[in-house]
Amino acid sequence: MKQKKFNSKKSNRTDLSKRGDSPNIGISKSRTACKRCRLKKIKCDQEFPSCKRCAKLEVPCVSLDPATGKDVPRSYVFFLEDRLAVMMRVLKEYGVDPTKIRGNIPATSDDEPFDLKKYSSVSSLGEEGILPHNGLLADYLVQKGNSMASSAITSKSMASPQTINVQRKEFLVNSKKQDGSALLPETGSPMTSDARAEELRRCNKEISALGTMRESSFNSFLGDSSGISFAKLVFTATNFRQDSGDDVLDEDIKQREQKYNGYAEAENNPHFDPLELPPRHAAEVMISRFFVDTNSQLPLLHRELFLKKYFEPIYGPWNPNIALASDQTGINSAFEIPITSAFSAHTEPKRENVTEKIDVCSSVDVPWYDTWETSQKVNMRPIVELPTKFHIPYFFLNIIFAIGHATQVLKSDITTVATYKRRATKYIASLFSSSDRLEALAGTLLMVIYSIMRPNVPGVWYTMGSVLRLTVDLGLHSEKINKNYDAFTREIRRRLFWCVYSLDRQICSYFGRPFGIPEESITTRYPSLLDDSFITLTNREIDDYSDLPSPNPSSKVIALAMYKIRRIQASIVRILYAPGAELPRRFMDLESWRIETYNELERWFQVDVPKNFEMMNCKFNSIWFDLNYHYSKSILYGLSPKFPTLNDTAFKIVLDSTKGTIDVFYNLCVNKKIGYTWVAVHNMFMTGMTYLYVNFYSKNNINDCQEKVSEYTEKVLIVLKNLIGFCESAKTCYTSYKILSSVVIKLKFMQINDAKGIFSDSNPLTSQANRMSSYDKKTNVLGFDDGTFDNKVFNRTNFEEKAPFDIPLDEFFTELEKHSNVSQFNTLDVSEGNQVINESASTNTSSALNCQSYTNNQDIMDILFQVTSGSVWDEFFVRSGNGNEGESSYDISKGKNSESGGIF
């Protein structure tokens, strides 16, 4: 019986093997052990494409060629299918249709016959007539197909896995020589031993290395909510003549680009002094700006706790005449931290190698700033060391200095910002070794905020991932767990959670990624609206601060309004952009849900948004509420997978919301109050493109006149140009938008002088180009002053007098034709009435065009974020370290938040 049972199993395995690798062609695969299992002399399960042992150890699973002894794929069928799929995907990314490429071997009777001469010439490409497997042929095909970007295409976008692994190993080697400044907090228990801290250090260095792998941005997922596009016009404009034209010779742009080098020099300055502190008055200004502009929206720091725990040990008591989001209430100078509290600083003995003079100056009653200042006067810097008890205060102060100084990016000094951040990361290991994990979470959240503003290692996506893991590990999303803590701790936990929630929803919405914590798992209440001066550690009579009314003004109304708009935005993204999202049962259809969401958005703007400084208890710029209001309407009624076409109502709402967004950013630019640079670039470019889309396609007079379109177009370009030097993707977006806006305006507002019809030529696109070229000579369609922005209000008269931006339309439309199906344009008529579709076309033709428009918007929705999101990913998400931020080149093929630190 046992023998029969064994034979039965063997028979089953044999039947499985006969099925082969591919169910479609029935090719039997060789059942042989892999190389590693052979060398280890262990049983191989012979699974494809990798055995379980190799997959578990994350090592290549290959076989040995019995003839040559060299490594070979375990299945050539799997290998060739994968290789072909990769090449076809890369060709599509570069605008080449793989299905139109014909080889020498015919596949159907309609193909060209076999050419023996071509087959014989293959032997010249490699030994024994075999094509080389080093990627050169793939490089050649991709570069050949990428005709619209014939200028320098960096080879990094096609780096082989071997190259990426080498880069990762080099980073790991270099990171061992550093001081652990790139660490991330893990989610384990408090760090009470050196072994646990060392384990955390190694783990987070690996995360940092993962975040710096310079793989192609196309390998990084960017979802539908990251942006929309309108067909091949966008694709052509973003790849057309990027390295030619007036911008290359623009000295102003070249000077702006020099700022990248300043940031890199600050990151690598060998004379860096980690102990240096700004003067007290400068520190007070930056801290005040941080609390008004950033902490008011994300109240992760309790004001009095911050002053008592971090500021006073370094600078001494705070000046009561300086408000910290406390214009109407003041600061509670009697705030105390009980020694038994979990929030008290656990000091350690002073280092023994510090001189006697420094010991005296470092007494309990003397702030460390006085000690440091004294050491500078008597030239004792070489022997001064920072006591361990000041490491965490140094981190918090310096990262807040960096954020506070960078909130007005057009005024800030990029070198100073980088230096403050570098000092903070010098002491970040002490933060992650703290027994207070809420403190570690708050510090990491500050790093996330900085990473949104400036390049950082690891990037914001990986830092935010660590924050989310720690948040879930602490149970901050669950109100049930919060009930186990005292009122003050419960309040801090709620505040930290909603800060994490806001940042997660913001980042994921911009880049179309799944949210870190699902809505159905969140039960945590909103934090209290009381001002921080009324929330103390010593009041044991209060059970829950969130239950108390707030009779006095408080900046918490700003944060609460931001929490609510993030929830609305998250609902929009989840319903309209997530492929598997379900509509709430109380709604009959998507349109009824959208109307209800629109009404909810209006209620938020009219009721929840504070209307004056007195209510906000500080001078927070309320323009950020306008920005979120317009942005939310844009994503609610703009193109999305659930609404790939727009009706008249959507066209009207999106037109108004995009103009509102452009006005807000232009106002911030004029007043030099833009911050969070890459978010501003991303939002401004996407909004500008959406504005052009609406004006290009909308009918029934739902569009702006030529003068108005030109005015808003220049506003977009002014903002993008002023951000060059602070965000590397700004120049790419500036050039692409400049080209596309000129073409769209000429297409939309051209005047037809030829009565013979616009498609008299055999090439419809070339015919359009000829007409546009003649029109360009007669009309000043679009002109831009590339001089330095002088901070003056937009002058329409001066704008109309400027020389037009000359676009070689013959070349543009020739390039456009390469990526468009000409038959799609056969019924197009750019008439004087601005009708895109010929009114005399048949019903069937119109239906076909509508179907094509539906598919077009659905299929190529990712074109725009190749310019912003792809480049932003490379710059801020997987940025390489070692101070090379200012030197990295930009590839056009690879490729929101601003007043004084406002977060859009």
Swiss-Prot record:
InterPro entries: bZIP_sf (IPR046347), Transcription_factor_dom_fun (IPR007219), Yeast_MetPath_Reg (IPR052202), Zn2-C6_fun-type_DNA-bd_sf (IPR036864), Zn2Cys6_DnaBD (IPR001138)
UniProt keyword annotations, A-Z: Activator, DNA-binding, Metal-binding, Nucleus, Pyrimidine biosynthesis, Transcription, Transcription regulation, Zinc
Entry's Gene Ontology BP terms: DNA-templated transcription; positive regulation of pyrimidine nucleotide biosynthetic process; positive regulation of transcription by RNA polymerase II; pyrimidine nucleotide biosynthetic process
Localization annotation: Nucleus
Biased composition, class Basic residues, residue ranges: 1-11
GO cellular component, one term: nucleus
Binding site for Zn(2+) 1: 34, 37, 44, 51
Region (Disordered): 1-27, 883-904
The organism's place on the tree of life at top rank: Eukaryota
Composition-biased stretches (Basic and acidic residues): 12-21
PROSITE patterns: ZN2_CY6_FUNGAL_1, ZN2_CY6_FUNGAL_2
Keyword Nucleus: yes
UniProt signal peptide: none
A Pfam family the protein falls into: Zn_clus
UniProt: Zn(2+) 2 binding residues: 34, 51, 54, 61
DNA-binding region: 34-61
Stated role: Positive regulator of URA1 and URA3 expression.
Assembly: Binds DNA as a homodimer.
Name of the protein in question: Pyrimidine pathway regulatory protein 1
Organism per entry: Saccharomyces cerevisiae (strain ATCC 204508 / S288c)
